[in-house]
Amino acid sequence: LVRKLARDGGLDLRQVSGSGPEGLILRADVELALATARDHRASAPAPVPVPSVAPAGERVPLRGVRGAVADKLSRSRTEIPDATCWVDADATELMAARAAMNAAGGPKISLLALLARICVHALARFPELNSTVDTAAREIVRLPDVHLGFAAQTPRGLVVPVVKDAGRRTAESLTEEFGRLTEAARQSALTPADLTGGTFTLNNYGVFGVDGSTPIINHPEAAMLGVGRIIPKPWVHQGELAVRQVVQLSLTFDHRVCDGGTAGGFLRYVADCVEQPAVLLRTV
C-alpha cells in the first residue's frame, strides 16, 4: 500500500525518512511527504513568460525579384558542390582590338560581346561546362547550344537575361542583343522567355568597380565566368616591366561535371584569348 501510494503521487521513496521500527516507511510518512511537496509547489512563484524579441530594424519581405533570386541562389548553394579558380590576364590587346573594330566604322562592338565570343569558343573546347546535372537520373547532360546569361542591374535588383544561340552570333549581333535585353531589364519589360533557358552565365561585375568575386552558379547551369574591372597595373610584358590593362577572371564550376583540370584549362584558354585575341576574333 505504501509503495502504491508513493507511485501514484510521483514520490521517490528513497527521499523519504521512515518513522517506523528500524526506519520503516509508514503510510503516514508518505502522506506527510506528499503534502509537503504539494505545499512547496503551491508556494513556488509562477514562471514569468519571456516575450519573444524580434530582431530590431526594418523588415523587408523576400518576394518579387529579390525573392526569386534568393530562392534560386539558395538552391544553387544547397545542391551544387562548387569550386572557384582565378587568374589575372593582360587585356591590353583585347582593348586595342575592340578600339580598332570600332574605329573601322559600323555599329560599335561592346566589350561584353567580345568576352561572350571568347566564352563560346572556350565552351566548344570544354563542353563539360556547358551542361547541367539531372539529379534524378544521375546523369550529366551536355548541351548542344550555348544560351548565354549575363547579369543586368535593374531598379528592382539583379536579373540574368539570356542571349539565345550565342554561339551562332557575331560580335555585332551579340552587342545588339545585350543592349536590347539590358534596356528591357531597366524598363521591367523582360519576358519569361528572356529570363530562362540559359546554359552558361557571364558576370561582368567590373562595371561596379570590383576587381574580383566568387560567382554563385545560376542553377541549373554548371558554371559562371566572372570578369572584374580592367585597370592599369604593373605587368611583365615581353621581359620588361610595363603598365598594362589587367583584369581578374574567376570561374565557379560544378565539381560534379568536371575536375579542376578541366575548369583550369577552360579559364586558362579564356585568359589566353583575352591576352592574344587577334587570331580568335579574326572572323568577327
Where are each of the predicted segments found?
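C-terminal catalytic/motor cores of large multi-domain enzyme assemblies
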Residues: L5-D12, P21-L24, A28-D29, A37-V284
